[in-house]
């Protein structure tokens, strides 16, 4: 059985707290100088505190969402994303949490989550063919705040994701001026990307792809679509390579090729809700292009 986001969070929290809670209970017993089970010694005593620590950890992990609005919102948002994709309800959930963080003055304190929700929401608007709403959403974060308030471990990926959404908006609008402006800001970060870091490569390559699509250089865009096929061991990269190729051939009016790559993408999908939405978006785009011939 596959665990959802909330269940994985509870399990992870339980595992991480387990040793600490076991030690805490053993120390508390010694501090109180009250041995509740004096007849249990040796390994049995160790097992007792281990079990008690596990039970306490599980209870605490289960109760955290009850008392933490941020954790509760994160569970709802990520569960919706994993189970149904970037739906209208997903947009509403992210909007609620974004507004809560702003009104409570905690947006900068939890900027990693705030900026993630904004980027995901903007991307969801693009799936709905609503670039203007995506612009309004992504404009709630900026590069300087990402550099200042995002933790160092995730800062690079968050910044790349920010540029990725901006460039995707430029592509949707076919706005070369916007694409050039985004590229000027993004270039220093893109140049630092090491292709061995697959996560960063996937995002950076998509930024380049969207840039060339927005500026009408479809040959260069196709080169970047093909780069994903250098990582065919990763099924998601194959999916991206085919998906990006579909976009290129729609723009160039080569609908037979677009159909071929779309079918390849359908074969490469892992059937996540998000990938199904991307495929539906591409199918709709191809049908529109054919109807407009």
What are these regions (language model features)?
Residues 1-91:
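N-terminal alpha-helical membrane-insertion module
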Residues 37-38, 42, 50-51, 71, ...:
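Acidic, polar-rich low-complexity tracts and alpha-helical solenoid repeat scaffolds
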Residues 71-79, 113-123, 158-168, 200-211, ...:
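"A position-specific structural signal for the A-helix of alpha-solenoid helical repeats
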Residues 205, 213-293:
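Long, non-transmembrane cytosolic or organellar matrix-exposed soluble domains/tails
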Residues 164-234:
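Alpha-helical adaptor scaffolds
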Residues 87-95, 99, 121, 250, ...:
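Membrane-protein extramembrane domains
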Residues 98-111, 143-157, 173-175, 189-198, ...:
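Flexible helix-coil transition and linker loops at the boundaries of alpha-helical arrays
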Residues 47-53, 80-103, 126-146, 173-187, ...:
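Helix-turn-helix repeat elements of alpha-solenoid scaffolds
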């Amino acid at each position: 059985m596959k665990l959802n986001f909330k269940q994985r969070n509870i399990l992870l929290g339980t595992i991480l707290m387990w040793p600490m809670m076991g030690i805490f209970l053993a120390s508390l017993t010694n501090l109180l100088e009250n041995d509740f089970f004096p007849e249990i010694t040796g390994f049995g005593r160790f097992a007792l505190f281990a079990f008690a620590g596990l039970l306490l950890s599980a209870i605490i992990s289960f109760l955290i969402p009850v008392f933490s609005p941020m954790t509760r919102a994160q569970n709802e948002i990520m569960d919706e994303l994993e189970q149904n994709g970037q739906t209208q309800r997903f947009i509403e959930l992210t909007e609620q949490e974004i507004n809560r963080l702003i009104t409570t003055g905690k947006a900068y304190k939890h900027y990693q989550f705030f900026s993630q929700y904004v980027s995901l929401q903007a991307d969801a608007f693009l799936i709905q063919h609503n670039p203007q709403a995506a612009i309004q959403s992504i404009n709630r974060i900026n590069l300087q705040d990402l550099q200042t308030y995002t933790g160092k471990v995730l800062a690079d990926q968050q910044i790349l994701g920010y540029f990725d959404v901006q460039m995707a908006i430029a592509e949707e609008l076919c706005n070369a001026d916007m694409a050039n402006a985004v590229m000027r800001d993004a270039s220093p970060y893109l140049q630092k990307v090491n292709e061995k870091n697959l996560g960063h490569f996937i995002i950076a390559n998509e930024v380049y792809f969207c840039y060339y699509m927005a500026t009408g250089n479809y040959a260069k865009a196709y080169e970047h679509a093909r780069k994903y096929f250098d990582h065919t061991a990763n099924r998601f990269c194959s999916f991206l390579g085919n998906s990006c190729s579909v976009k290129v051939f729609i723009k160039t009016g080569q609908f037979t090729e677009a159909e071929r790559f779309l079918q390849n993408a359908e074969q490469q999908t892992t059937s996540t809700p998000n990938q199904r939405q991307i495929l539906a978006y591409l199918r709709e785009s191809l049908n529109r292009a054919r109807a407009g011939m």
